[in-house]
Amino acid sequence: MKSRKLARKVTSKYHELNAKLKTSLTKEEKVAIKDEIKALGGIDKYQQASVISTQFFNTSKFIIKTLRQFINNNSVRTKTNVPNVLEVGAINTVLKKYTSFKVRAIDIHSQHTLIEELDFFDLPPERDYDAVVCSMVVNCVAEPERRGEMICRLVEQIHEGGIIFLVLPSRCIQSEYLGMDLFDSFLRGLGCIELQPKRITPHLIFYFLGKSSTTASSSSSSSASHGSSTVSSWPDSICATIHSLMDTQTLERLTPPQAESTASTTSASANYTKKFRLYLPKAFVEYRTHET
C-alpha cells in the first residue's frame, strides 16, 4: 500500500466497522462485520495504513524543531548536553540522523538494523529520558486495555522536566464516550501537564506533555517502596489520582448504560476504580462514526 488516499480509506473503514461492533447487533451480523474486517486486512493492514497516513507529514523534523525550542526556552530540562530520546514504534531512522540527539529507536517488529527490536511493554520504567516520541502507535496496540496501559508507561519513561510527543488519530479521542475533555483529565490524572497547547488537525492530534514534580516524586517513592511491583500497582494509583480530579458528572460518563448497575453498598471510590479498570482504557478504541 503506497497511496495516501487508499490508506485513509482503509483506516476510515476500519474505524467504521469497529464502531458497528459496539452497537446492538445479532450474532450473525457481528460475524459478518468481523469477516469484513478480516477481508480488509485486519489490524495489520490498519497499522500499515496508519503509518502511510502520517508519512507525508515530516513528523521527525517537526519533533526535533519543537524539542529544540523547548530546550532553548527552558520548558524542557535535559540531564546532559546531548538530549536522550526514546522513539517508540519507530518506522524509520530519520530521528537517529540528528547527531545532536542521542536517540534510542525501538519497535516490536524492527524493519531496520538501527532500530532495536523490543516490545515497549517489556521496557522497565527508567524515568531517565529527556524526551519520548510515540507517534501513531497507541492506536495500533491490539488489546484495548493495553492502550491505556501504554500511555501510563510512557509517562514513566521521562524524568521530571522531560517531554512526551504523543500523536494519535483524532477519532481515537473525539469519540462518543471519551472526548477531548475527558482524555485531558486522564492525562492530568497521570501527572501530565501540557507544555504547549495541543496541535489539532483534521486527522491527527499532537500532544506535548511534561511531568509534574508531584508525579515524579511520588513515582520515585513508589519504586523505593514496592520495587518490581511498581508497574502492576499503576492502575490503583492512577484511579485514586483521577478520582480526586473529576467531578460526579464526569464520572457518570465513564460507564456505558449497560454497565451502570452496581451494588448500592459499593463505595464511590471502589466503584470508580472498577469503572476505570474495565472501561476507560477501552475508550481508546471507541471509533464512533457520527452520521450527519
Which positions does each model-derived feature cover?
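Class I SAM-dependent methyltransferase "Motif I" SAM/SAH-binding loop
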Residues: 54, 86-93
